[in-house]
C-alpha cells in the first residue's frame, strides 16, 4: 500500500476536507453532551472554524494556494465565520450571489459616465470629507458672524435667486404677451382703455423700486448682535413699601427690556423697574456731564457718581454720602 509520503505533491496541496460543513457519522455509544441539540462538539467545530479562517486569508493573498476554494468575493460567496453559530448555518448560502446594493449600482453608473480626458477615479474608494476652513457655515471664528464679511456671500445668493426669478418672470411675461396679442386680435380695445392700462402699468413699475429700497434699508437696519447697555431704573416693593433707584439696570441695547432683575434689600424678592431712563445728567442731558458748575466732586474711579450727577441733589441720602450705589433710597 502506498503511504501519504509516496503520494504526489498535488494531494499535499489540496485539502483533505470539504470547506462546507457536513455532519460526521456518529458511533454507537455517542450521547448528546451539550445542552443545545443539532450542534457539533466544541473541539471539532473550533478546528473547522480556524481552518475556514486560514483558507479565506490564503485565498485573498493568492488563489493558487487553495485551488479548490474560489476567489474570496463577498458578492459571489457569502460565508459567515462566527464561533457561536454552527458551520452548517454559516455556509448555508453556498455559492449563491448576494444582492447588489444601491450604492454599488450608483458608483458603477458614475464610473461609466466619466468624461473623456478626466482623471481615472480610484475604483470607488471613499475617503472622509474634511470641513473646509473657508466655509462660512463651518467657520467658528467670531469675525465670520459680522455683517461686513457676510455681505459678499449674501450678495452671491441673491444674484443666483434673482437670475432664476428673472428667467421665470421673462417666460411668464412672454406667455402673457402672446395671450394678450391673441385677445387683442379678436377684440380691439378702445383708446380710453389703452390709456388707463398704460397708466396702471406705469404706477406698478414706479412702486416696485420703492418697495425694494425699503426692504434693503430694513435688512441693513437689523442688528446682528444685541449687547447690553447700562441704564437707570426706579424700583418699588409693595410688600415692604420701599422705593429705590439703581444705576445698575442692564437692558438690551436700544430698548428698555430689562435683562437682570434686582432684589429688594429686606424681603429679597426680585423686581423689574417700573421706569427706566438713560444714564444722563439732568441739566445737560448727556451721559458724561459737561456742565461748567458741577454740583459735587467727580471721582474717576467711580464713574456712576459722574453719571448720576444732579439726580439726588437735596435728598436725604445723596451720592456723596452713600458708599453703595446699587441701592439708592
Swiss-Prot record:
Keywords: Cytoplasm, Developmental protein, Differentiation, Metal-binding, Oogenesis, RNA-binding, Zinc, Zinc-finger
Comp. bias intervals (Basic and acidic residues): 166-177
A Pfam family annotated for this UniProt entry: Zn_ribbon_3CxxC
Source organism, top-level taxon: Eukaryota
Tissue-by-tissue expression: Specifically expressed in ovaries but absent in testes.
Phenotype on disruption: Mutants exclusively develop into adult males, due to female-to-male sex reversal. Defects are caused by early oocyte apoptosis mediated b< the p53/tp53 pathway.
UniProt GO BP: negative regulation of translation; oogenesis; positive regulation of oogenesis; translation
Compositional bias ranges of the Acidic residues kind: 149-162
Single GO molecular function: zinc ion binding
Compartment(s) of residence: Cytoplasm, Cytoplasmic ribonucleoprotein granule
Disordered: region residues: 106-132, 146-218
Keyword Transferase recorded: no
Keyword Ubl conjugation: no
Positions of 3CxxC-type zinc fingers: 231-314
Family annotation (InterPro entries): Zar1 (IPR026775), ZAR1/RTP1-5-like_Znf-3CxxC (IPR027377)
Principal location listed in the UniProt entry: cytoplasm
Gene Ontology CC: one annotated term: cytoplasm
Summary of the function given for this chain in its UniProt record: mRNA-binding protein required for maternal mRNA storage, translation and degradation during oocyte maturation. Probably promotes formation of some phase-separated membraneless compartment that stores maternal mRNAs in oocytes: acts by undergoing liquid-liquid phase separation upon binding to maternal mRNAs. Binds to the 3'-UTR of zona pellucida mRNAs, inhibiting their translation.
Domain characteristics, as noted in the entry: Disordered regions undergo liquid-liquid phase separation (LLPS) for the formation of membraneless compartments that store maternal mRNAs in oocytes.
Protein family per UniProt: Belongs to the ZAR1 family.
Protein name: Zygote arrest protein 1
Lineage, opening ranks: Eukaryota, Metazoa, Chordata, Craniata, Vertebrata
Name of the gene: zar1
